[in-house]
Every structure is written in C-alpha cells, then in structure tokens.
Amino acid sequence: MFAFDGFVPVIHESAFVHPQATVTGNVVIGRDVYVGPGAAIRGDWGGIVIDDGCNVQESCTIHMFPGVTVHLERSAHIGHGAIVHGARIGENALIGMNAVVMDNATVGAGSIVGALCFVPSEMQIPPRSVVVGNPAKVVKQVSDEMLAWKTEGTALYQALPARLRESLHPCEPLREVPAGRAQHEMSYRTWKETRT
C-alpha cells in the first residue's frame, strides 16, 4: 500500500489484498473484496471505488486519466489479467480474463464481457448483456440461468478473503508429494458443464 499526494488507500478490514498487489493513493476498497497478486490499483491521477463483494484477480490493472473516478459496483468480478481504464463496471458484472475496458465506458449491471474482449472508450453496454470481440459487440442477453451461474462464481471470491486471512502464510516447499495428500473438492462448474 502506498500513500500518494496526501491520499491514503482505505481498505475495509474484511477485504483481502494480497501482499504482492499494489494499491496506490485515492482508492477505497469495501467489504469482502478480494485483490489478487500482481494486481495494480492506481489511484494516483483519480479515484478508484471498489464496492463490497468485488474481486480483482491476478495481474489486473485499474487506472484512469487525470480527474476520473473508476467505480466497480457491488459484486463486480474482474477476471485474471483484465484492464479497467477510466470505466464504470456495473453491479454483479463480469469482466473476462485479459479483457480491456476503456475510458468512459460503462458495463451494465449483470453483464458478462468475454475473455480477450476490447470495450472501446465511451461504449455503453446495457444491463445483462453478453459482450465479445474486438471491438466489443453485444451478442445476446444474460439469461436468469447464466446470471445465477455467474453470481455463484463471484460468491466463491466473496468467501475467499476470510479463508486467506485464516490460513495463508509463507512456507518452505515440500520436496515430494506426501502420501495421502488432500484433494480439492469440486465446488463449481464451467458454464458449459452447467448446460449439459
């Protein structure tokens, strides 16, 4: 965490910001927010508001032009490697892995922006839209079933901060896999798997 120009980041005690993430300046992070390693959240030229229940995954960048405020509304889900630059992301919207959302764009509530999508400046995406491509194009509406699936995935990230605070710690690696090593249980399925 870094103060800048008199602005000190504000991070709710229930949030988890990985030690390898960088949060700078005029940033406000709400309850149960997850920020992954390698994320850069730069409130140096403007403000960044990350509402309760959002997640900003590994290697994401959030930034803006001078004087702009970036707002991630409640339960927004920013996938691995995505860039949000000077945009507004609506409540319970998902930005897919390595997608880019540019200045003054708005992603409507409950929308899903596909992986590798490029949302150009000023684009206004209506609520509950599925958006793909470069440049981005709305291809269909988010069904109730798809929204429930997305919300379930975000809930996993909303539970993660408490689990990380409880059990994440530096360690020395083992040199071999021990007998009887525990396995992770399957607690979520891909969209395709839910459809079959």
Regions found by a protein language model. Name each.
Residues 6, 11, 15-64:
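A positional/architectural concept
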Residues 1-10, 44, 52, 58-60, ...:
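Glycine-rich hexapeptide-repeat left-handed beta-helix
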